[in-house]
Amino acid sequence: MARMIPEFSRHIDKAPPFRKTGNPELDRGRQTEKELYIFLRDLLPDNWVVRYSFEFTRRTDELIEHEADFVVVIPRCGVLVLEVKASESYGLRNGVWYFDPECRHVREGNPFSQARATRFELKRKIQDYMHKSFPGLFGSIVVFPNARRIPGENAAPSSQDPDIIMTGYDLVRDVRNRSLARHLEHTLTLFGDHDLVEIRRSAFNQKEMDAVVRFLEDNYTLEPYRAFTDTYYSHLLDQLTQEQIRLLSSL
């Protein structure tokens, strides 16, 4: 069982990210992510770490906000970002993505471009935190839990590799065969020079993994600070004193 961040072991349906809202589209997405959360938690090894819904900002010329649906930290390997798409069907025609295979309802953005952008920005953010180049492998995969490839058609768009796509059919097979960890690790090994994969894997030792996990834990604490309130009352007293001086001066 993998370590999940955050951890929702009890009453997962009542956890804020998974509560029903009454919005069918939003609730379908929440339900899908909850199901994937449980599969990742229950089927990945104990020494794997999964961060769910990691929101972060990174500043270049401006401050940009990003969110990684799932970040899987794989020991002796690296980090794999999962971009999850909850819709039941997708179509791609002439470079435009649609929500339906008949290609009538346009959706915003290319899911592979989104996964790649999140991967690049998260890698840079972690490197900023570690103050060095990322030591292991760093990859991304697009997950369509509620859809599958149409039999007899291409396994992937001609612009993409089939191994960076995971459909509901793939997930069901991995759940039944207990092969989810092997599948994700294989995908991550594709993101690197073939001759350097083993070197990069060995460089991602326990110390480096612990540093990445600390980053993903995102711990932060603020302590009590009374000076603000004290300054407020001091300000009121000063204002009152000034008012009294003005009144006395007018007598």
Give the location of each predicted region.
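Hydrophobic residues on short alpha-helical segments
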Residues: 248-249
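Intrinsically disordered, low-complexity Ser/Thr/Pro/Gly-rich regulatory segments
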Residues: 1-239, 245
